[in-house]
């Protein structure tokens, strides 16, 4: 199924039903009093999260959702039927934004969490409501009010404990697949991963969710490549794993690749840049130990600060168990 993480829909709540003007007319009761009933309230529109959904694709094709109107009141003090509510189901992690005002209406981060996004109109009052000691035959009534109408932007942000980032073909997908069994495509060319993928990792009785997003390239913040569009899916993560290829097939400089990623991350969002970030130096099986030491020295000199880093080989699972164990321990703190 195609991964869609953003869409705009229109929601229209039902109008309230009108109140009724009516008088009791029965045999032997020629001057019966008012008996006009109230209208019914308009139907509401709700959004509800569902763990079984992982894309907004269904809402890309149906753009307008309208709840039924409340029915008008009638004689014999009969109230109109309330318009039934409607629910729109979305994936867990969906952020709800008022498209016009940019106000954040809500954020559905739990299963079966729901939020009212368009309130139905209030019912109109029948003439019975206006009877008094000085007005025995009221002809007043009120009309039902109009239901709310809104344009809503829905933005899906995946919920994961750990997120991966790095250049295309750095080995992010291989790592995620090797530790979680996630069904992510792997090949020896850039941008193999076209959409975010979630994997569940179990280690030493502890469990965490890891997200794999498409690789980031230079000038991604200006629209190049794929990754910057999906960086938002790292916003809920507690740790970021910055995967670095120590032996790039394009012969690029690993230190320069680190600089590119950090620069693009900072330009995208400073709060994301400031998240806890571990440096994962990958593909150590393809390079000599002496070369690894030289690269590490250059990285430390570039970063200027002490940053936690790991030496691993995703494909041969060297150092991976220790990494997973440390992640699980960190998340429990």
Swiss-Prot record:
Xref: CDD domains: Obg
Q: Which Pfam families match?
A: GTP1_OBG (PF01018), MMR_HSR1 (PF01926)
| Residue ranges of every copy of the OBG-type G domain listed in the record | 160-332
| Annotated transmembrane regions | none
GO BP term, pick one: ribosome biogenesis
Give its localization: Cytoplasm
Chief location bin: cytoplasm
A GO molecular function for this record? magnesium ion binding
Q: Give binding positions for Mg(2+).
A: 173, 193
The EC number of this protein is: 3.6.5.-
Q: Which InterPro entries match?
A: G_OBG (IPR031167), GTP-bd (IPR006073), GTP-bd_Obg/CgtA (IPR014100), GTP1-OBG_CS (IPR006074), GTP1_OBG_dom (IPR006169), GTP1_OBG_dom_sf (IPR036726), OBG_GTPase (IPR045086), P-loop_NTPase (IPR027417)
Q: Which enzyme class?
A: hydrolase
Report one GO cellular component: cytoplasm
Keywords of this entry: Cytoplasm, GTP-binding, Hydrolase, Magnesium, Metal-binding, Nucleotide-binding
The residues that the entry says bind GTP are: 166-173, 191-195, 212-215, 282-285, 313-315
Q: Per its UniProt record, what Gene3D superfamilies does this chain match? A: GTP1/OBG domain, P-loop containing nucleotide triphosphate hydrolases
UniProt cross-references to SUPFAM superfamilies, sorted A to Z: Obg GTP-binding protein N-terminal domain, P-loop containing nucleoside triphosphate hydrolases
Report the cofactors.
Mg(2+)
Query: Per the database record, which ranges form the Obg domain?
Result: 1-159
Q: Which family does it belong to?
A: Belongs to the TRAFAC class OBG-HflX-like GTPase superfamily. OBG GTPase family.
Subunit composition and interactions? Monomer.
Please give the function described in this protein's UniProt entry: An essential GTPase which binds GTP, GDP and possibly (p)ppGpp with moderate affinity, with high nucleotide exchange rates and a fairly low GTP hydrolysis rate. Plays a role in control of the cell cycle, stress response, ribosome biogenesis and in those bacteria that undergo differentiation, in morphogenesis control.
What is this protein's record name? GTPase Obg
UniProt source species: Buchnera aphidicola subsp. Schizaphis graminum (strain Sg)
């Amino acid at each position: 199924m195609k991964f869609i993480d953003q869409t705009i829909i229109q929601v229209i709540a039902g109008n309230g039903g009108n109140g009724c003007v009516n008088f009791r007319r029965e045999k032997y009761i020629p001057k019966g009093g008012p008996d006009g009933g109230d209208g019914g309230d308009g139907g509401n529109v709700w959004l509800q999260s569902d763990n079984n959904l992982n894309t907004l694709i269904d809402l890309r094709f149906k753009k307008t959702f309208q709840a039924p109107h409340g029915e008008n009141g009638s004689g014999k003090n009969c109230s109109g039927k309330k318009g039934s509510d409607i629910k729109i189901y979305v994936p867990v992690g969906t952020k709800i934004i008022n498209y016009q005002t940019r106000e954040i209406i809500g954020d559905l981060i739990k299963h079966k969490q729901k939020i009212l996004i368009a309130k139905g109109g209030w019912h109109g009052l029948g003439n019975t409501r206006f009877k008094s000691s000085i007005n025995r035959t009221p002809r007043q009534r009120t009309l039902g009010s109009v239901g709310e109408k809104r344009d809503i932007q829905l933005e899906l942000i995946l919920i994961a404990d750990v997120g991966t980032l790095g250049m295309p073909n750095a080995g992010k997908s291989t790592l995620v697949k090797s530790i979680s069994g996630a069904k992510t495509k792997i090949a020896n060319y850039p941008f193999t991963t076209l959409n975010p993928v979630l994997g569940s990792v179990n280690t030493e009785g502890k469990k965490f969710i890891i997200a794999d997003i498409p690789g980031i390239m230079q000038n991604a913040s200006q629209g190049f490549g794929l990754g910057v569009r999906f960086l938002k899916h790292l916003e809920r993560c507690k740790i970021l794993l910055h995967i670095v290829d120590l032996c790039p097939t394009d012969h690029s400089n690993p230190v320069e690749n680190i600089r590119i990623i950090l620069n693009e991350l900072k330009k995208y969002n400073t709060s994301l840049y400031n998240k806890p970030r571990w440096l994962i130096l990958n593909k150590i099986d393809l390079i000599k130990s002496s070369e690894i030491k030289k690269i590490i020295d250059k990285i430390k000199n570039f970063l200027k600060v002490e940053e936690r880093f790991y030496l691993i080989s995703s494909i041969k699972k060297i150092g991976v168990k220790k990494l997973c164990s440390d992640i699980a321990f960190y998340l429990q703190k």
